[in-house]
Amino acid sequence: MSPPPSAHTAASTATPLLDLRITRKLYGDRTILADVPLQVARGEIVCVVGPSGCGKSTLLRIVAGLDTDFRGSVKLGGIALDGPSPRAGVIFQEPRLLPWLSIADNVGFAAGPRGGREPSVARLLDEVGLAGVARQLPATLSGGMAQRAAIARGLFGEPDLLLLDEPFSAVDAITRMRLQTLLLDVVERHRTAAIVVTHDLDEALYLGDRVLMLAPNPGRIDDEIHVEVARPRDRRDPTLAVLRARLLDAFQQLQDRADETKRRTLDLQGAEA
């Protein structure tokens, strides 16, 4: 009898929820992203890492429909996107809560009318542990609580895909671990998929079913690591330590290449001056 498929194998063989093909993304005459194919299945978490300037946040903006000026295509649930979609919830590094609205109104306001298909704001706030502060203003919350509110806002409307851009980098270590656990619970409970951009390699290995390494100049998928470690994950698992060493080595190679490219550019500019 064959062994049961791993979580990643099951996700990989399913029809992809997200089918992304970026042929080229330009800023002026500079290519930011090139030849980036990405498929993500429901229930899968994909973490994206890479040196600064490699196009990680730009990739998220394209998937979210916030940047449509690129060559390629984005399909979510088999439907081509040409702008923002209620099926994708975006969570930024900063919570970006409207200061004059209560926490409950912030969660409900961001999504707008959705025909009653969304879960109630009260239920979402209870899910992220903020039921007791629903009527408070954002200024009264800690950074971790504000980010919990942002997660609830991202879930409003029952999106199929969560897009998180450095979501936990502005909070302390204990709060970060709690928010990571919350994200894992949310993805499992709602059967969503998630793409997480992070600079933290340990976070990527802890959260991700896959970790993609974007190379700079231009951004391409340079490496892909399948994290075949079952959840709940022990951060001390020796398998994660091996993968971390591989990621660190790949990251350092990419950083060295980026530094060398920058040095050559400066040399050329100096020669032309």
Curated annotation (Swiss-Prot):
Keyword list, A-Z: ATP-binding, Cell inner membrane, Cell membrane, Membrane, Nucleotide-binding, Translocase, Transport
GO molecular function, one term: ATP binding
Major subcellular location class: membrane
Membrane topology: Peripheral membrane protein
Residues that, per the record, bind ATP: 50-57
CDD domains listed in its UniProt record: ABC_NrtD_SsuB_transporters (cd03293)
Any one GO cellular component localisation term in the record: plasma membrane
Catalytic reaction annotation: ATP + H2O + aliphatic sulfonate-[sulfonate-binding protein]Side 1 = ADP + phosphate + aliphatic sulfonateSide 2 + [sulfonate-binding protein]Side 1
Compartmental location: Cell inner membrane
Record bears the keyword Cell membrane: yes
Entry-linked InterPro entries: AAA+_ATPase, ABC_transporter-like_ATP-bd, ABC_transporter-like_CS, ABC_transporter_ATP-bind, P-loop_NTPase
Domain ABC transporter: 17-241
E.C. numbers: 7.6.2.14
PANTHER family cross-referenced by the UniProt entry: ALIPHATIC SULFONATES IMPORT ATP-BINDING PROTEIN SSUB 2, TAURINE IMPORT ATP-BINDING PROTEIN-RELATED
Family that this chain belongs to: Belongs to the ABC transporter superfamily. Aliphatic sulfonates importer (TC 3.A.1.17.2) family.
Quaternary structure, from the entry: The complex is composed of two ATP-binding proteins (SsuB), two transmembrane proteins (SsuC) and a solute-binding protein (SsuA).
Function: Part of the ABC transporter complex SsuABC involved in aliphatic sulfonates import. Responsible for energy coupling to the transport system.
Descriptive protein name: Aliphatic sulfonates import ATP-binding protein SsuB 2
Gene this protein is translated from: ssuB2
